[in-house]
């Protein structure tokens, strides 16, 4: 719907025009607009060509990147791949519509990663299939539905490489994302102490996020990017603190995997947070390794807890050092 809100009106204003799509496209159209237009449908399938005179369009299906009806179109004479949602970014272009007109890494990489991980991230295998499908094409520009147009060899290679990496669920960089939830500030202090100990050990690229204040999409993008994730949260009404529960649920929904995770819970009279987080990462995720013995702090960080935090920092540092970034 974010791409075709004027489609019904267009068909009604111009009754001789045709809507090109696959069978799923037309089913979706009728579901959203409740106005079947079968006389205006032109159904296509994988590999079909439409000649427009000078231009010839070839269809390639990309199911679940990120909707089931998605079809990208390759225009032969210009080498243009109209890639639908693939290779897009969040945000708007600022005058320059081509990535090479900007410092594209600084301008678009963070938002391209956040877009991929939160919109397409669940469908890594489907993205890999799509990349294989278009690998034989002579692509001279990529025109997605969101974000800039990639039109130079450098920018095209850049975004294709990023999608190949992101869809493999492997980290791009050594570093630690610490995601915490805190009701009174005590759990925040635990997160800050762990970050301090990691820094003392030479760990760089430490990101601290309060899951109650930061939109999950930003935390998820960095969790994808860096090798290690730490979740720190208190018990709330015999359950895991709800904003942390929601964050972990978001990670699960996006098929987060192939990373290292460490866990710290906090409780005052009945412990549930630590056990719940351990159960989530052990049972609900694939290829997640829990690094260091999960900790369960009682109410607030005390002097006798510091050695436990130091031990976890040692283990995380060793985990980071042992990993190779490809």
Cite the ranges covered by each PLM segment.
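Short hydrophobic segments within beta-strands
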Residues: 83, 178-181, 264
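Short internal beta-strands
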Residues: 16-25
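Short acidic active-site motifs
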Residues: 6, 214-219
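Catalytic core of the metallo-beta-lactamase
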Residues: 12, 33-102
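Short, charged N-terminal beta->alpha structural module
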Residues: 179-200
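FMN-binding flavodoxin-like domain, especially the glycine-rich phosphate-binding loop
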Residues: 93, 104-142, 147-149, 193-209, ...
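Terminal amphipathic helices with adjacent charged low-complexity linkers/tails
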Residues: 141-173
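Di-metal (Zn2+ and/or Mg2+/Mn2+) metal-binding site signature of metallo-dependent hydrolases
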Residues: 1-11
């Amino acid at each position: 719907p974010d791409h075709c809100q004027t489609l019904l009106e267009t068909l009604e204003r111009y009754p001789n025009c045709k809507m090109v799509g696959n069978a799923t496209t037309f089913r979706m159209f009728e579901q959203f607009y409740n106005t079947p237009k079968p006389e205006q449908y032109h159904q296509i399938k994988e590999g079909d060509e439409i000649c427009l005179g000078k231009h010839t369009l070839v269809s390639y299906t990309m199911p679940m990147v990120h909707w089931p009806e998605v079809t990208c179109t390759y225009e032969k004479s210009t080498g243009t791949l109209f890639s639908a949602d693939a290779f897009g970014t969040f945000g708007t272009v600022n005058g320059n519509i081509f990535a090479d007109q900007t410092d594209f890494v600084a301008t678009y990489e963070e938002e391209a990663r956040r877009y991929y991980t939160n919109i397409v991230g669940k469908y890594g295998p489907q993205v890999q299939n799509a990349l294989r499908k278009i690998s034989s094409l002579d692509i001279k520009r990529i025109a997605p539905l969101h974000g800039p147009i990639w039109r130079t060899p450098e920018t095209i290679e850049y975004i294709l490489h990023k999608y190949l990496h992101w869809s493999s669920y492997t980290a791009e960089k050594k570093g630690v994302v610490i995601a915490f939830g805190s009701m009174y500030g005590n759990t925040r202090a635990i997160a800050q102490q762990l970050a301090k100990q990691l820094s003392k050990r030479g760990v760089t690229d430490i990101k601290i996020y309060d899951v109650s204040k930061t939109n999950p999409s930003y935390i998820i993008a960095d969790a994808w990017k860096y090798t290690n994730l730490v979740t720190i949260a208190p018990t709330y009404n015999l359950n895991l603190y709800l904003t942390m529960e929601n964050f972990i649920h978001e990670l699960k929904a996006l098929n987060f995997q192939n990373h290292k995770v460490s866990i710290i819970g906090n409780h005052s009279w009945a412990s549930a947070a630590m056990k719940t987080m351990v159960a989530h990462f052990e049972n609900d995720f694939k290829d997640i390794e829990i690094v260091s013995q999960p900790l369960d702090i009682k109410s607030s960080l005390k002097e006798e807890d510091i050695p436990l935090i130091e031990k976890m920092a040692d283990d995380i540092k060793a985990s980071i050092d042992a990993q190779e970034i490809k």
